[in-house]
Amino acid sequence: NTAFVAVNTSESYVKPSGKLVSVNMADGSITGTCDLGGQPDSTAHDAAGSFVVIAIENERDEDAGDGRIGQMPAGWVSMVSVADDLADCATLKTTDVTGLAEIGADDPEPEFVDVNGLNETVVTMQENNEMVVIDANGTVISHFPAGTVDLVRIDTEDERAALDFTGEQMGRLREPDGVQWLDDDHFMIANEGDMDGGSRSVTVFKKDGALVWESNSEFETPIIQSGHYPDKRSDAKGAEPEGMEVATFGDKTYAFILAERASTVSVYDVTDAASPVFKQLLPSGIAPEGVIAIPSRNLFVTANEADLIEDGGVRSHVMVYELQDAPAQYPTLTSEGMDGLTGWGAISGMVADEDGMIYAVNDSFYGYQPT
């Protein structure tokens, strides 16, 4: 009956502050507030609802100096017990995560948190490219670098008028954002990137740091084939996998990964945590930022933050999806099966052959002329 909302009240980057607000979902009233002492980024809770964990990021100012980490104060992870549907502020405790990362050890920036069935919390520290696992007592039980990925068959140039997937990026830092436990031993991360990295991929680790599975550049493949690739982000971080949700529907467990720049949701069957299987690409609203699954109703919901009203476009909104025992309704047009990885967009004309093949031409938006 209670939602726990982390609110950023910082007056500046060097004086971060925030609070955890308890909200009665029946009437929207605020029933309690805890001072967090820093700028929160995300929250999670255990299955029983007995405690809330908060990532206190104390984010860097990207316009200060060289914009890199090393800007105090450092971040940390907080936990607070829940009693009678209220956060008990007197139980608030912090876990120091300084000195763990190889990158910016003195300035950790916890980004996203999730709690497993053993009440262990996994934390992404994005700019630090570090993973941390904390037990229910707030003790760090493991930590390790998120590592790097060798990317091939990607577009690395911002020509704004060409889709050329022949580029490579070797040793690209993962710099994960979203994270979700797949079971009590495995978790998946969405490697958005923020400072030096962004591997355009999703990865599964065991909590002891063992690398189990990596999508590499194949995460972007269905996005490219379905006409969703954001070409203007080619010289940055591509489709940018960011938010994530994992939930069990019947006897299947699915991961839903939001690609902020492509405005898509990639659905993976992660019933076998060590071997995720791509199932479907879904269209989202513009710039999906949040996602929640409602398995009891066979639903999941995305929150899409882009507000394009000044340009005559759509407002920020939510989208609701329902799991059905039926063929996928999307995508309706794909370049899957073509020789080579083929992106497309701005279709101007199409004609169908008798064998079911559609021949199409891009309009002048993709008018790049090779030299």
Where do the language-model regions lie?
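Sequence/structural signature of beta-propeller domains
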Residues: 1-371
